Amino acid sequence: MSAISLINSGVAWFVAAAVLAFLFSFQKALSGWIAGIGGAVGSLYTAAAGFTVLTGAVGVSGALSLVSYDVQISPLNAIWLITLGLCGLFVSLYNIDWHRHAQVKCNGLQINMLMAAAVCAVIASNLGMFVVMAEIMALCAVFLTSNSKEGKLWFALGRLGTLLLAIACWLLWQRYGTLDLRLLDMRMQQLPLGSDIWLLGVIGFGLLAGIIPLHGWVPQAHANASAPAAALFSTVVMKIGLLGILTLSLLGGNAPLWWGIALLVLGMITAFVGGLYALVEHNIQRLLAYHTLENIGIILLGLGAGVTGIALEQPALIALGLVGGLYHLLNHSLFKSVLFLGAGSVWFRTGHRDIEKLGGIGKKMPVISIAMLVGLMAMAALPPLNGFAGEWVIYQSFFKLSNSGAFVARLLGPLLAVGLAITGALAVMCMAKVYGVTFLGAPRTKEAENATCAPLLMSVSVVALAICCVIGGVAAPWLLPMLSAAVPLPLEPANTTVSQPMITLLLIACPLLPFIIMAICKGDRLPSRSRGAAWVCGYDHEKSMVITAHGFAMPVKQAFAPVLKLRKWLNPVSLVPGWQCEGSALLFRRMALVELAVLVVIIVSRGA
């Protein structure tokens, strides 16, 4: 099948699954199976379409029969299709068993509509249609938040972003006479994109991507959402915002230097602040949401380095920045899916998202524990996992940036490398905190003490994603060259070599060699260790005698107290008169429903 046929089939499966899951919502288990199987098949078709185009290194165009509008699949947006497809596949399978919980509501309609709209946004050949599909996707996501109160901030900020994007589209139409992306690209080679339109687009799409300080909705939306929904927020919804920013920045191929510098600065702020705020959180989903912000910043660092390379006309910097950013985009979606779904499995058996109320889960849920350890290590960019591979290439782009001709670039290169290293250290601390407090030690509550293994499909989905994280790191030398086809600019092969992380992995592994030999050769010469109760100075061991998440984060909290105090200023919406009113949340929910219904009717009538 051609890539266009695969996409048509995938979108059709998503839509059919959404409708049927809604019709059978009176039977929750059956609705879950319909939504899960349909979503999994649609995701497989989506990933296959992206893989076909990426390996062929040639873009294709055609029509999406269901809505009757032109689409294009380039090697660049094929990476988004692969990301959406892989994550959607395992989230859909996981969602089948998720529906078995008594407190879970049917979500097949919203999840499959979200996936269909996201795919349509990725392949849109018209910027206006891109914005409309992204709007439908975001509205579906609003209804996946746990309640109207937590979704109202997302709705308010999302409508602001849509308004800015609508103004940007109107200005583009006035200036260039079209919103077709191919025509815009050709015309902008003669008349470059104005910085006013670019700023409107970056703010509008930045609200969707959660770039700090436009991130206010992110922790609220993730905190108490269902695990499949939270996973899709981070791996699908926010990544569409990044695609919009990159698309605008690459139009015409003549971006000014300050665009790239602005993206680099925003990326560094988002990465550092997101990692810092994550460390002081104890709700695991809110913590992971802040870590999503950190990784959005890291991806933006890579994309910003690529845009800076365009301005400086340095093909090597373009390749390193874009390839590193795109690879980390894929990798982040994989390991963040592991973490959200793994955290959801723990909630499924314990009813707790506060890690202070857990502990000892590793013995109760060993499969989920090991998969979560892999995901946390990937999040901390530890080798040989996929989180390390993408960041390593981004580090190389900073080294290349420090050797460029522009003074500001030479200044930023070392500073960004140091900033990313500090952010990585915060991620390692957060990994130790989450895994140590949640999965090690003694259970702190009866629910944690009585936890059992997660259901089969939930465990299989989490483990499969963890295996993908390992493959993404170990197979990076073979996967990274494939992404070079996604760089939409002619490159000079002699000047765009990427140092493969495998060499670095071997260098890091060398110090471990003596310990490996000792473990193999020790035999029975050393006495085996005996285990007993922990010694606590003559007192009986109590469950409270364990390190807490609050105590673990306290040194960092004290060291960065001035930065942490900015949280209220970075999210000043609570100061808006009437914002805390309960009626406003319900009003926004109804407005979102009306807007979603209108947009769906328009799209369906267009297809008919």
UniProtKB/Swiss-Prot annotation:
InterPro entries: ComplexI-like_HydComp, NADH_UbQ_OxRdtase, ND/Mrp_TM. Keywords: Cell inner membrane, Cell membrane, Membrane, Oxidoreductase, Transmembrane, Transmembrane helix. It is a multi-pass membrane protein. FHL comprises of a formate dehydrogenase, unidentified electron carriers and a hydrogenase (isoenzyme 3). In this non-energy conserving pathway molecular hydrogen and carbodioxide from formate are released. It comes from the Bacteria. It is found in: Cell inner membrane. One of its GO terms (molecular function) is NADH dehydrogenase (ubiquinone) activity. GO terms for biological process: anaerobic electron transport chain; anaerobic respiration; ATP synthesis coupled electron transport; formate oxidation; glucose catabolic process. This is Formate hydrogenlyase subunit 3. GO terms for cellular component: formate dehydrogenase complex; plasma membrane. It holds the Pfam family Proton_antipo_M. It comes from Escherichia coli (strain K12). Belongs to the complex I subunit 4 family. The chain crosses the membrane at residues 10-26, 44-67, 76-93, 116-140, 153-173, 197-218, 229-251, 258-280, 296-312, 416-440, 453-476, 502-521. The keyword Cell membrane applies.
